[in-house]
Amino acid sequence: ENCPMYNSIIEFIEKDTTKIEKFIKESLLSGNMMRFEEELLDTVLEFGRSLYQEILESIEQTIRNSEFRKQSYHVEHKEDRRTLLTRFGNIEVKRAYYAPKHGGKRIYLLDKYVGMDPNDKVSQAALAQALKEAVETSYRKGGEEACLTEDVVTKQTVKKLIHGLEMEMPEEIPQKK
């Protein structure tokens, strides 16, 4: 059995190393270090998205084939798709919707196992980055900095995130007279 990221790694070796060699010749060795870095970053981020997607698909497949799942749940929808904005950019997540065999709430088991809310459109890491930036600058800038690609979190989402945070305020320290 191949490891969960086998295909992404093989594809990177076969295609992207050639692409990187081309970037070295066309950009770096012709004095354009900035262009080289941009091209390299895009390639590495694309690899990250591919890897992330393949790992999630592998986990979904493991869940689907597990004895626990077969005994407890039947597959209601085989391949629901959703887009998730991550630090690497948008990835497409394919997951099955399961119904308990003995009654109860339907569930995306993949979401449960990886700690994702079924309605999340943005990963926790991307939200954390957006929040970090928004605290220092603006909601818009926070949304732009959520991931390392051109994809953005809307400023409304960042605003809701910030306003939705419950913060424990320190007790007021009495002033000495």
Across the structure, where does each feature detected by a protein language model lie?
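Short, positively charged, Gly/Tyr-enriched micro-motifs
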Residues: 16-24, 91-177
